[in-house]
């Protein structure tokens, strides 16, 4: 059934028909498609009648919240057809670049100049009609309230700025794309969840011929403004909508995206990233290409007691005369269900991390609905295990080199930080013991995961477990330097301070005996509080690094160190490590940590 009346008008006639109920208002967004052709088909008298406009027309679509107003104009700006298309309108796509609308006993076939024009028109129409004819994969897996909040959040320029100012993130993406320019030169690119469009601009810098930038939030409008102001409208096409619901006019050579959340999987955008492979050519690539989740046991009595102390508020027998103690158990459960988002000194880790890898080129969406990570840790230290720490690395495996982006605690801090999941009952383990178990992540419709962790010390049989809600983390990061664990000093710090000073030229800060050049002991003598130590662990082959002091809560930019002697690679391969500020300083025994995955090609480790 037609939603509104429409009239086809012969050449030279004035406009006819009006937008029906629910039609687009005067403030709606207008999209223009030149070169359209119109064919009217009817059988009012029992015979098929056809009328085709001989000249190309200009089609205008005025998008509204519930319907789209469509009008076609001749070169003389005479309206030859006008109607409103809502969710009740009978309509369908025809072939690769045509669309048919049935109004009463007449049908109107609109042919667009290019398949790209048709896809843009079709995406606008689907958005206006509310997608009620079929539910997309995204809609099936996501609660509406969660989706609304999610896209509203990413529609703010301030949030885009927060991500763009994570210079490790942004700089690594740009370096990965530009250093692998042959993967982009004259290629077709799909940017999934483009946000401000920054990755699309990087692809354009690398020489991409066409970039389709898909964005479901209102940020798409801002991205379109940036595309126009940077004179890239001929190469970057912003497509408003979800990648599960829009249409692309052609297959692409490479997909780029920044789909990672806390613990890699939070927000479930990785599934949209994998869904986009329906547009990827068989020989196509994806940036990022693989993702590694690392987990390791940690000890942190201070964090553990913080959570219990908060819950002890409910242990009061007389709070303004009310006994709250009956809720203390529920409060403990609630606080310990929260994953803790912050950073930490790497020396709290008690074993080498276990790695779980997702190859985005091979993985399917369903693989991320239930993620089971078995682990077996060989304990390097004795003490209480308070939980598991998580971080991730992603690799951009290009034709020229592989670039890594890491959120490891040894690396410069990013807006992903690290995540820790506590046990309600800590486990005691000795050096040489094995801690085994499973971390199970079950996807939920709130665009997140329910986490179940079960761990056991094999030698004693002692076991602990916890259930956590990744959608409701505790943001603990304060911008201050994380403290090393108690008992980390194996010589006198006071003596070391003065002994170290004797090896320095205090006026110039010249390094002696391999100490970092930027360490100025005069700051210690003046008060010591300005010396920034973060994630204190000496790593082999890191080279001399500039150590800068950052403001509280800031995301730091990178320094550069070339030619690490510990570079890996085959014969003739090159390796560059873009090292960072105050992440690597001296102190404490090293803990063996899993390094980024070795790829048999030229590799680069930028800002990570």
Swiss-Prot record:
Q: Which GO terms describe its cellular component?
A: cytosol; nuclear replication fork; nucleus; protein-containing complex; RNA polymerase II transcription regulator complex
Mark the residues carrying the PTM Phosphoserine: 217
Recorded hits in Pfam families, A to Z, give: CARM1, PrmA, PRMT_C
**Gene that encodes it:** Carm1
Q: What is this protein called?
A: Histone-arginine methyltransferase CARM1
Q: What is its biological role?
A: Methylates (mono- and asymmetric dimethylation) the guanidino nitrogens of arginyl residues in several proteins involved in DNA packaging, transcription regulation, pre-mRNA splicing, and mRNA stability. Recruited to promoters upon gene activation together with histone acetyltransferases from EP300/P300 and p160 families, methylates histone H3 at 'Arg-17' (H3R17me), forming mainly asymmetric dimethylarginine (H3R17me2a), leading to activation of transcription via chromatin remodeling.
Binding of S-adenosyl-L-methionine, residues: 160, 169, 193, 215, 244, 272
Q: What is its EC number?
A: 2.1.1.319
- Which positions fall inside the SAM-dependent MTase PRMT-type domain? 147-454
Q: Which GO terms describe its molecular function?
A: histone H3R17 methyltransferase activity; histone H3R2 methyltransferase activity; histone H3R26 methyltransferase activity; histone methyltransferase activity; protein methyltransferase activity; protein-arginine N-methyltransferase activity; protein-arginine omega-N asymmetric methyltransferase activity; transcription cis-regulatory region binding
Which species? Answer: Mus musculus (Mouse)
Give the span(s) annotated as Required for nuclear translocation: 347-380
Q: Which PROSITE patterns match?
A: SAM_MT_PRMT
What is the top-level taxon of the source organism? Answer: Eukaryota
> Which post-translational modifications are recorded for this protein?
Phosphorylation at Ser-217 is strongly increased during mitosis, and decreases rapidly to a very low, basal level after entry into the G1 phase of the cell cycle. Phosphorylation at Ser-217 interferes with S-adenosyl-L-methionine binding and strongly reduces methyltransferase activity. Phosphorylation at Ser-217 may promote cytosolic location. Auto-methylated on Arg-551. Methylation enhances transcription coactivator activity. Methylation is required for its role in the regulation of pre-mRNA alternative splicing.
């Amino acid at each position: 059934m037609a939603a509104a009346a429409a009239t086809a008008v012969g050449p030279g006639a004035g406009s006819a028909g009006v937008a029906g109920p629910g039609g687009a208002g005067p403030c709606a967004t207008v999209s223009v498609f030149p070169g359209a052709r119109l064919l009217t088909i009817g059988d009012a008298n029992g015979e098929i009648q056809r009328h085709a406009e001989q000249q190309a027309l200009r089609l205008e679509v005025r998008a509204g919240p519930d319907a789209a107003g469509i009008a076609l104009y001749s070169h003389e700006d005479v309206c030859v057809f006008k109607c409103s298309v809502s969710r009740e309108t009978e309509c369908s796509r025809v072939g690769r670049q045509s669309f048919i609308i049935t109004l009463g006993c007449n049908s109107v076939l609109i042919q667009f100049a290019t398949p790209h024009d048709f896809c843009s028109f079709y995406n606008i129409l689907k958005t206006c009609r509310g997608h009620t004819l079929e539910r997309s994969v995204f809609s099936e897996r996501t609660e509406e309230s969660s989706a609304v909040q999610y896209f509203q959040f990413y529609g703010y320029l301030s949030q885009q700025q927060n991500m763009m100012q994570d210079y490790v993130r942004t700089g690594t993406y740009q370096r990965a794309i530009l250093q692998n320019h042959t993967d982009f030169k004259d290629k077709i690119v799909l940017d999934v969840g483009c946000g401000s469009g920054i990755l699309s601009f990087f692809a354009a810098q690398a020489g991409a011929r066409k970039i389709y930038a898909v964005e479901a939030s209102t940020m798409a409008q801002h991205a379109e403004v940036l595309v126009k102001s940077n004179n890239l409208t001929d190469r970057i096409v912003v497509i408003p909508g979800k990648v599960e619901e829009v249409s692309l006019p052609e297959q692409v050579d490479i997909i780029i995206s920044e789909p990672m959340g806390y613990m890699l999987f939070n927000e479930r955008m990785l599934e949209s990233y994998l869904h986009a492979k329906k547009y990827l050519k068989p020989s196509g690539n994806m940036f990022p290409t693989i993702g590694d989740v690392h987990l390791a046991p940690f000890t942190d009595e201070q964090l553990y007691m913080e959570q219990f102390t908060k819950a002890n508020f409910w242990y009061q027998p007389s709070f303004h005369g009310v006994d709250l103690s009956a809720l203390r158990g529920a409060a403990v459960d609630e606080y310990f269900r929260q994953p803790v988002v912050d950073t930490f000194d790497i020396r709290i880790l008690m074993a080498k991390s276990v790695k779980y890898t997702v190859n985005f080129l091979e993985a399917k969406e369903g693989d991320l609905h239930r993620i089971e990570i078995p682990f077996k840790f060989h304990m390097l230290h004795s003490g209480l295990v308070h939980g598991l720490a998580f971080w991730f690395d992603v690799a951009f495996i290009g034709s020229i080199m592989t670039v890594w982006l890491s959120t490891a605690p040894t690396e410069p801090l990013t807006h992903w930080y690290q995540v820790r999941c506590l046990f309600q009952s800590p486990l005691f383990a000795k050096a040489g013991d094995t801690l085994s178990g499973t971390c199970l992540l079950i996807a939920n419709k709130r665009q997140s995961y329910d986490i179940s962790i079960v761990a056991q010390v094999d030698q004693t049989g002692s076991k602990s477990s916890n259930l956590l809600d990744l959608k409701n983390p505790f943001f603990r990061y304060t911008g201050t330097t994380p403290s090393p664990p108690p008992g980390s000093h194996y010589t006198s710090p006071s003596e070391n301070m003065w002994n170290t000073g004797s090896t320095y030229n205090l006026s110039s800060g010249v390094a002696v005996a391999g100490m970092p050049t930027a360490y100025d002991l005069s700051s210690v003598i003046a008060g010591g509080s300005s010396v920034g130590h973060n994630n204190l662990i000496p790593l082999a082959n890191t080279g001399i690094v500039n150590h800068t002091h950052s403001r509280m809560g800031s995301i730091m930019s990178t320094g550069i160190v070339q030619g690490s002697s510990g570079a890996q690679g085959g014969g003739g391969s090159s390796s560059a490590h873009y090292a960072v500020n105050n992440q690597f300083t001296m102190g404490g025994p090293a803990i063996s940590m899993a390094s980024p995955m070795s790829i048999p090609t030229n590799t680069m480790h930028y800002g990570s």
